[in-house]
Amino acid sequence: MTSFAHRCGIHDDARAAALSRAALLAGGLELVRFAWCDVHGVTRGKTLVAGAAAKAMMDGVGMVSTLMLKDTSDRTAFKVFEPGGTADLPGFGQANNLLLLADPDSFRQLPWTPASGWVQCQPWFQDGTPVELDTRRVLQRALARLAAAGYGMKCGLEVEFHIYRIDDTRAQMDPSLAAWPGLPPAVSLLHPGYNLLTEAWYDLAEEPLRIVQHTAQALGLPLLSLEIELGPSQVEAVFEATDAMTAADNMVLFRNAVRQALRRAGYHATFMCRPPFPNIMSSGWHLHQSLVDARTGANAFRRDAPAPGTSAADAGHTLSDAGEHYLAGLLAHARAMAVFCTPTVNGFGRFRPNALAPQSVLWGRDNRGAMLRVVGECADAATRIENRIGEPAANPYLYLASQIHAGLDGIERGLRAPAATDAPYGDADVRLPTSLGEALQALQGDSTLVDAFGSAFIQYFTRIKQSELSRYELAEDKDDFQRREYFSRF
């Protein structure tokens, strides 16, 4: 009998070889987690006993389709049981089943739980057609468009987050206090903060940071450093640059893994931008990006010598023509792409003056107050653009796809960047959105990004985010809303 993977047209010699490698790695395992990344960047899925996992690698794992329609509280944002409730979403009516098919190349043994494997999946309709609303497919399409233009993408990740010591879970686990969403655990600080990169605070935090290190390295993630950030209990993980899809996959796995591994040891890790406490510092996800020539692998942003007639304030002094066009595209679509970089109500509280976070649509040369920071000099093979508007709770596939579509528009139209800023918190012609609602409106008003992502995806995405926003606007206690909505879930 033909397997579901064959019917989907994805089972070739390469996948068969990857399955063989996964089978070798799976020896001695008892359980395998089949995981999928939802629109919010949260992993969901099913855990199968080892005896059932081999068949599931070929025939898929059933998943209720409403998992793709959830807002950040896990409420379904579409009326799937009402006539016309999913008219714009063919194949999603009546909470029907989708099938998850695994990528055997992603198979790993989990280091924090005994005899358990993990494999990454993507959803398919039961007739063997791909679910195009899947966010990993959104990035795959963006990368295909980039490849057609002759480029690949390389990304390095700098991820700030918070680790707390768990003091009490009684309220969180008290059945009489269960709610939708519920209370997070009671926590205390890991380090007092306000002493950036100090070794003494690192020593205070070493036990959980060693767990982060061992977990990341056991999973094969290209971790470079773990650092003490400025805020209380705030840390940062820095990763070596990889191709774009690998970087996005790594971000999904890293967040998922460290939260679980730390929880077992009595710590609470959160990638919520602004945890629900006074005197915190916001966390950002700084995305370093460059394009590479698809034929040679050379950095397409590198310029061997400054363009004639340019000064240090000009993009062409450091960036190639393609690099300047890409930079200009990011600036042109900054307001529209902001919701993919900062997709939560909570994250927009980060955009404030003199906080090492941007407020305006500007670029700077090695300027950490600017939205876009150009890093490198002429003839530097590591020349790149750092986007500083992302929050660590962002869906990695959508974050990276937004960069590709915005940057490619700049290349295709030959856009030129304005002069670099040396006053990122001064007056500016264009400001970043200051709320989720404003960011959604900016996205809907940008026909270039709507066309690039596809109007069906934009309608789907905005409907789900609007559900989150509407509940926030109705909440009497806005702080309690964010505490319950984000602190445990991200």
Task: Kindly give the residue locations of the regions a language model identified.
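C-terminal accessory/tail domains of diverse enzymes
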Residues: T2-G27, A35-V42, T246-A247, A257-F271, ...
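Short beta-strand elements
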Residues: D174-V187, W285-R295, V361-W363, A370-G376
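Core alpha/beta catalytic barrel or barrel-like domain that forms the active/cofactor pocket
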Residues: K154-H162, W180-E199, L219-V238, A269-H286, ...
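Short, contiguous, pocket-lining structural segments
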Residues: A200-P208, S225-G231, D243-F254, F277, ...
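Secondary-structure boundary elements
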Residues: A144-K154, H214-P222, A247, F254-T270, ...
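Glycine-rich, often proline-containing surface loops adjacent to acidic residues and nearby aromatics
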Residues: A115-P123, P232-E240, S283-H288, A382-R384
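ATP/Mg2+-dependent ligation/transfer catalytic cores
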Residues: M1-S225, A247, R431-F490
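Hydrophobic/aromatic-rich core segments of domains that either
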Residues: M272, H286-A305
